[in-house]
């Protein structure tokens, strides 16, 4: 019966540790949303016709 309170405390500590960042962010870190936006923008640019501007405005 002595182990039950210790076990409960350990479970609470493990659950609260998941919300803590393991590593601090550096100035070189970029959020994933900006990476996804860049990939979509590059994909859109490849679909555009270089000589016909109206082609870029038509969603496919």
UniProtKB/Swiss-Prot annotation:
Expressed by the venom duct. It is found in: Secreted. It comes from the Eukaryota. Contains 2 disulfide bonds that can be either 'C1-C3, C2-C4' or 'C1-C4, C2-C3', since these disulfide connectivities have been observed for conotoxins with cysteine framework V (for examples, see AC P0DQQ7 and AC P81755). Its main location: secreted. Keywords: Cleavage on pair of basic residues, Disulfide bond, Secreted, Signal, Toxin. One of its GO terms (cellular component) is extracellular region. Residues 20-47 form a propeptide. Residues 1-19 form the signal peptide. One of its GO terms (molecular function) is toxin activity. The keyword Secreted applies. The cysteine framework is V (CC-CC). Belongs to the conotoxin T superfamily. This is Conotoxin Pu5.6. It comes from Conus pulicarius (Flea-bitten cone). The lineage of its organism: Eukaryota, Metazoa, Spiralia, Lophotrochozoa, Mollusca.
């Amino acid at each position: 019966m002595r182990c039950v309170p210790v076990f409960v405390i350990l479970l609470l500590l493990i659950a609260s540790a998941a919300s803590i960042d393991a590593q601090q962010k550096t100035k070189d870190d970029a959020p994933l949303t900006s990476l996804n936006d860049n990939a979509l923008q590059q994909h859109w640019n490849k679909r555009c016709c270089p000589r016909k501007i109206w082609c870029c405005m038509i969603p496919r």
